[in-house]
């Protein structure tokens, strides 16, 4: 495999995982065209590459990871959200694998997500009562966040887009919404990789034989390093009052790209 392609795929993963766009879809499209992978194989490869993003999150949020077992509220949040993510996400992952084998078009859910992001940006821009902190979340609200994250198992649906938007709509301030959405990603992504190993081992064997361990390792490292930069950048923006601009921009991009995808297909 061309090492430049490995680096490019890693960069795509490292950027798209933390933006409110579907990293699975971006990796699916890129690996499909750059490596001529079958769509379902490309989807498996995208999930396999999440190891790089997991590494980014573990490094960036290492202090939060250390305090999980000393902070009962944070532990409860991660347990509840991860449990609901698994309950909702695992069946949807199995369904997704079938959908991708039957010409499923991920542009459709991306359009709805783009519209949701634009609406969320409008809400953030004109709301004057967004003062709640993460520690004020109720158990029911944690369940909603877990369900939202589980739905992101579907191709075309962004995990960070779903969780961040849900937390913002619940009134959580943008800085906390982005921060704890990214933290909740860690156990969910580990579970996602585990599910991939369990249900699509034959796909993974094919990907390894086609791309090679060195190519995969390079892509994972590239995703990890890119992710560290992107996480830091987005969290800095989330501290400002301009976070709604991210929603407007990415929502518009998601809608335009998805409509272009529908026209081409």
From Swiss-Prot:
It catalyses: di-trans,octa-cis-undecaprenyl diphosphate + H2O = di-trans,octa-cis-undecaprenyl phosphate + phosphate + H(+). One of its GO terms (cellular component) is plasma membrane. It is found in: Cell membrane. It is a multi-pass membrane protein. The keyword Amino-acid biosynthesis does not apply. Pfam families: BacA. One of its GO terms (molecular function) is undecaprenyl-diphosphatase activity. Its EC number is 3.6.1.27. It is an enzyme of class 3 (hydrolase). Its main location: membrane. Catalyzes the dephosphorylation of undecaprenyl diphosphate (UPP). This is Undecaprenyl-diphosphatase.
